[in-house]
Amino acid sequence: MSPALAAGLQIAAVVIVLAAAYVPLGDYMARVYASPSDDDPSDDAGSESNGTGGGTALRTRTRPRTDSRVESLIYRLCRVDPRAEQTWIGYSLSVLGFSAASVLFLYVLQRVQGVLPLNGGLSGVSPSVAFNTAISFVANTNWQSYVPETTMSNLTQPMGLAVQNFVSAAVGLSVAAAVIRGFVRVRVGGELGNFWVDLIRGTLRILLPLSFVIALILLTQGVIQSFSAGFASTGLDGSSVTNALAPVASQEAIKELGTNGGGILAANSAHPFENPTPLSNVVEITAILLIPVALTRTFGTMVGDRRQGLTLLAVMGALFAALLAVTAAAEAGARGVAAEAAGAMMEGKEVRFGIPGSTLFAVATTGTSTGAVNSAHDSMSPLGGGAVLLNMLVGEIAPGGVGTGLYGLLVLAIVAVFVGGLLVGRTPEYLGKKIGRRQITLAALSVLVMPALVLIGTSVSVLLPSTTGYQGNSGDPGTPGSIHGFTEVLYAFASAANNNGSAFGGLTVTSDWFQTSLGLAMLLGRFLPIVLVLALAGSLVATKRTPPNPGTLPTHGPLFASLLLGTVVLVAALTFFPALALGPIAEAVQ
């Protein structure tokens, strides 16, 4: 089979599954996050006045399901009133409090794993690694500065890391639901919902069932599921090798579905125990994209105009397709001694996946906040590596992480509406809500968080003499080694600030500086935007909805999609072009 045909078949399989799941999954998630207060007749009138096709019919389709017995039991045990609503401040404090408790629990669990069951002879994790890992998994980044097989026990993996894979993804879904309510509701008190209800519903009704199905599919492909310590085998050179075993299938499913990315094995999805066949590779890519893509349908359903969701999906799809084309062309057309000897750019890639399966996975994992890898990104061609780096630098909105991609793109949509309003001399509006000074200020601050963390972290790191020894590639300024070394540092901070978790392997990040600085980048990159977008939703929910008029900029269709796409590209280009010119672009033209 030719590489072109293999690439086409894999892309077609992913697109077909995503298209089949788009409507049922998107509408199902809208029902999960629908609130009884959204059925208020005053809201229906508001939706109709906005001309979005909302009203009673829509509310009937999204009418919330009653709480299950399990959910009701959890509410009673945790003393949560599911009927209570929170303002953006209360919602933010709940998110931050829950995440802080999660960091503390995961840190302590790692430190004491040596005295707990199923430790496999492993001792407690060192303080710096435990700190970095706790923040990483709670922030949905899953950055791994350790070797999982020799660091984390078979109790820490499922009890600590896998649990965070579920709840960190559920936090992202909850925030996205709260932001959507900011557009849907009109509340003088500014209520956005109940974080604890959203968290529990997202975990029990969406993530757990889907993960169970995906885990079963992966088991049929040979992904392992075991609590044994491991087994010994003889390598090709005659030496004895210890092969680690772990409950991989159950964690692999939520690793991809929740756009987490942290592998239970060091080689991540390149390891045959995690991703053994081309079919399992397609399943994992589909799982990565499934919820972020369907959330655009959820958004359109909840706001009462599904064209809005399709417009966002078109922007996501255009960015994804463009970056996939660039990456695939760069990898397929790469030249050099190694590439010519192997017949293709196969360094760092698994033969069973080839270039098509590796590039599709790389673009999917960097276009979301997943960060899982089935190939070595550091071994990609300069343009290929630059493309996946750019995929993160545009904000991971193609299609973005679970929840984070949607609200990240909505923030950029508000910026695009504001720019469009300036062009025509009209007060900017989005879905009937006027975008004033407070709204655009919060949106701008949210957009600026990630670039500030990436550029400041990178510049300080490359200036510190103590970090030079941790760069696998270095040399005099302007030499190929120094250029690629700079790209490795830039990639690390882009990955951390965007809560991605993938890395260029040539950079050693076990020093106290990188453990701490990248940990802070993950922490601030996750929770500062969450607080800002919740504040934005709080200001929108208290804003009256205005009916459209002849001067209103339509926020659906090709015109607005082009405006939004241009805004995304312009913001990324103005912010990161100098850094990219010093890194992958300079490396490519040498």
What are these regions (language model features)?
Residues 1-590:
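Membrane-proximal intracellular helices of multi-pass ion channels
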